[in-house]
Amino acid sequence: MSARSFLSKGYVMSDSNQMDEHANASEALPISQRPASTAPGHWVLARVGKKVLRPGGLELTLQMLSEAKLTGSRVVEYAPGLGRTASEILAARPASYTGVDKDPVAAKHVRELVGIRGTVVNADAADTGLESGSADVVIGEAMLTMQGEKSKKAIISEAVRLLAPGGRYAIHELAVQPDTIDEELHTQIRKDLARAIHVNARPLTCAQWSQLLEECGLVVDSVHTAPMALLDFSRNIRDEGFLQTLRIIRNVLSDRELRARVLGMRKTFRTYQQWMCGVAIVAHKPLKGEDHDAQ
């Protein structure tokens, strides 16, 4: 049975112990006191049990991390959120791990997850306070999309400052496609996304994402895309596992307010599915004397 038919039939699973666990976990999340009707979409999805919140899914994240060459590297991660990617980074045995999150609740959560294997600072990605040239890899996922042009450039410029020459900046963001997309349609997608997820999302085309990185002084090494299928049943099975996907469905069905938000987001995602994708880009800071325009 597909998730769509499952939800449309209105099945409700009841398990008081598991529902209590869901409630307790939700209380520990950032913005937990905000009602589901007004909370940012990614934290609404976290409340129902989603752990993989990246537009291109876990597979695209893993491909990006592989190309970023983490083993033995000094890694800084912007906005680690729930710490799902942090766990993958640590599994790659970096020389060091530093998470940077401006939300104190998220920072505390990831700090507990990382433990003695790294550090987490409560700071803004555009002004981390970390030492220049102190990172070999900077990673950021699903965060630049939520920023305006000025903030996008400020965050990327901070990553460039943190990187040693030759260091890699890896991003996983939401993109619109094709690169020649009609501007009116692009604008409508932005507006409808903002209404659905309650965040002023401003996705770019893949070409625009690459251009933005280059304008900030980086050299793009690789670009990969994957379908934007964040709320598709099959994607959730792959990203979350079968049992966790069932828990997510149960949590959605057991809370009317959460259900309305999730179904609203799902409707918007499906409406524009052919024009959206997840994009992962790895770029590097040029070595001294390297021709920035050489591709």
Question: What does each model-found stretch correspond to?
Answer:
Residues R54-T71:
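Conserved alpha-helix/loop element of class I SAM-dependent methyltransferases that forms part
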